[in-house]
Amino acid sequence: MLNNFLNLELLNISLSYPFLFLITTAIVLLLCSGFWKFHRSFYIGISSLSLIVSAFLILNNANAQGLEAKAFLATLNNDIVSFYASLVILCFSFLYLLMQKEENQGEFYALFLFMIASLLLMVSSSNLVLIFIGLESSSLALYTLIAMRGSDNAISSAIKYFSIAAVGAGFFVMAVAFIYLKTGTLDLSANLALKNEFQKDPMLLGAGVMIFVLCAIKLSLAPFHFWLKDVYYAAHTNLVAFISVVPKVAMLVVVIRLFDFLNNTGFEYIIIVLAIFSMLIGAFAALSQNNIKKMFAYSSVVHSSLVLIACIPLLKEQNFDGILLAIFGYWTLFAFANYAVFMILSNYENNSYESLNGLLVKKPLIAFCLSISVLSLAGIPPFGVFWGKFMILNTVILNGYWYLALFVALSSVIMLYAYLKILIHVLFMKNDRVYNIKFSFIQNFILAFCVCVSIFAILLML
């Protein structure tokens, strides 16, 4: 074992370069910020460049070693799941950095890079210990970022998020202990040969349920979503856009690996009930909100539930590549529309619906961008999220879960009323206030790009 560990060829250290580079950059930024003060553009430039280099290293590894490479005694995987997830994480982290307007603290960007490195570690491993290390490292950094930016309630909301997630982490650790007790291994991919034992042993199935509790908390699935509304309301608006997309990508990878591990065990019935319950609770709760950010908090519950539904066929060993395309396709299209909405909302201190009154008259171009993005999130054709939802429905129906499509349609109709409330205020309500909406050239470009993706997403289907 020791000889294997010292064998550099088996270690394959190059697979760890993407997140090691981010960690090194974060340490340098942290040291620099302790001795010198730099402008925000310096921190954004260095952080953005490090993300680009990390993406290049991932692409280089995929080109040189393919998508079956392993490292550190097969605890790190360069498979198709980690490849796509890593690129999505880096892409939307890069966009988030370019959306920054005010943050000048070097510690903020150092913590941000530490978090992204932890997320990359998390999606690149099927080893439960490394997944837990990546999860907790990224979560601790995220709690701090929430507390550093936002309203006066940001600290209390971060503590609430931390407290609820700590309970989920306890379930995860106990589940890991149960799995190791029964199988003698901590690798999810190694356990795939033990499906028959899973069917017979309630302890192992219970361990899978306990792991999923933490996944549900991080994906903000009902009834594990109680932290979400407070965080959305208190955190800085641009950070909310990031929270709603990037950390959930890493958690989706854990769900994909877990479901691939638990297939043919009867676990699917638990997930089906939870997904339907979560989707409907989120949709009905969104209708009753008077604050836009809180409405989008419950909207994200619905979107997370939809992606969970796309994962369900994995529990029956169905077409893996097709399911993966539906999951990442939907989430990417959702992310672009979501970023556009929150970029516009970041200009408002008051996120009530009334604050959007008269936007069409005063800022018609901004009103157009907001309307297109909201229609996309609502799943109205021919805009982006509609095609993502189409891929999910196609996947679940082809795999025999046609009844889930009915609940998806019901939740979509309910959410349509919540989204239309925004459009009514933007397009038809009058207001004499002066809108002070300012974007830099880069931010204007990001907004235009996100809206164009929503408009021309149909081209991706060809």
Swiss-Prot record:
**Enzymatic class:** translocase
Which InterPro entries does this entry report, sorted A to Z? NADH-Q_OxRdtase_suN/2, ND/Mrp_TM
Ranges annotated as spanning the membrane:
15-35, 42-62, 80-100, 113-133, 161-181, 204-224, 239-259, 267-287, 295-315, 323-343, 366-386, 396-416, 441-461
The enzyme's E.C. designation: 7.1.1.-
Q: Where in the cell is it found?
A: Cell inner membrane
Where is the major localization of this protein?
membrane
The function of this protein is: NDH-1 shuttles electrons from NADH, via FMN and iron-sulfur (Fe-S) centers, to quinones in the respiratory chain. The immediate electron acceptor for the enzyme in this species is believed to be ubiquinone. Couples the redox reaction to proton translocation (for every two electrons transferred, four hydrogen ions are translocated across the cytoplasmic membrane), and thus conserves the redox energy in a proton gradient.
Q: What is the annotated quaternary arrangement, including any partners? A: NDH-1 is composed of 14 different subunits. Subunits NuoA, H, J, K, L, M, N constitute the membrane sector of the complex.
This chain's protein is named: NADH-quinone oxidoreductase subunit N
